[in-house]
Amino acid sequence: DGTTACDLRYRGYRILSGKYGLSGLPAVYGAEKEAQTLEVVLEDGRTGIQVTLLYGVLPKYDVITRSAQIINTKENIIYLEKAASACLDFVTGKYDVISFYGRHAMERNYQRIPVSHGNYVIGSRRGTSSHQYSPFLILTEEGTTEDAGACYAMSFVYSGGFQAEVEKDQFGQNRMLMGLQPEQFSYPLNTGEVFVIPETVMTYSRNGLAELSQNLHRCFRNNLCRGPHKGKVRPILINSWEASYFDFDGESILKLAEEAKELGIE
């Protein structure tokens, strides 16, 4: 009907053993003994929009995950124009925001700036996350170092377009948000259809950035990675590009492989 308003009201909740899964999307996993799921159901009675907020709790990593499922329960088509999986508000405090940018041959450069009034936004419109900007943000208290101070992280488990934001309002309150890239995004949600927003992994440390990184390392290594090499030493791969660039032929590649074998490269 042309309106962009949505008045979501609380309808109920469930607490389940184990970590929720996301059909068709990568997500952190967890068995019944190591994780719990909280489902919070919200509904707009007029538009028929129903939203289920999904929280996954993994205490041993100090990690909480967030996703959401949006359902259209009415006959009209609803167009989704913006969809974020996580949003945190910080009522008081002065913070810095840390993000990582890059390009070819210079990936993942560290950038830390004070959060000022207005909206700080990074993202990707390419359809991929890439090394131009990582789908990852850290909000730290002023003065936080590797070993001391409070900090919060959001990591988007999605390799497509994304948008991450940190905003300070007129009262000095800060908001941190992670979700899908809204530019050129308009998804028609038909009657009974469910739209699942990719997952954001959140963690907190009061002992500096090193502990924050370690929380994510342990969670991703043990509860996100899959496959036969999980928990094992990986085979070593020789990189012919750095060795030869464009100056190679069959003979030079065979010589490189023979020398690599002598060094124990599989």
Please describe what each predicted stretch is.
Residues 172-190:
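Short acidic, Pro/Gly- and aromatic-enriched capping/linker segments at domain boundaries
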Residues 83, 159, 201-202, 238-243:
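Active-site beta-loop-alpha junctions enriched in small/polar residues
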Residues 6, 187-206:
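Short Pro-Gly-centered flexible turn/kink motifs
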Residues 215-266:
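An acidic-aromatic substrate-binding cleft motif
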Residues 166, 180, 207-209:
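Conserved mixed alpha/beta catalytic, RNA-binding, or beta-rich assembly cores of soluble enzyme
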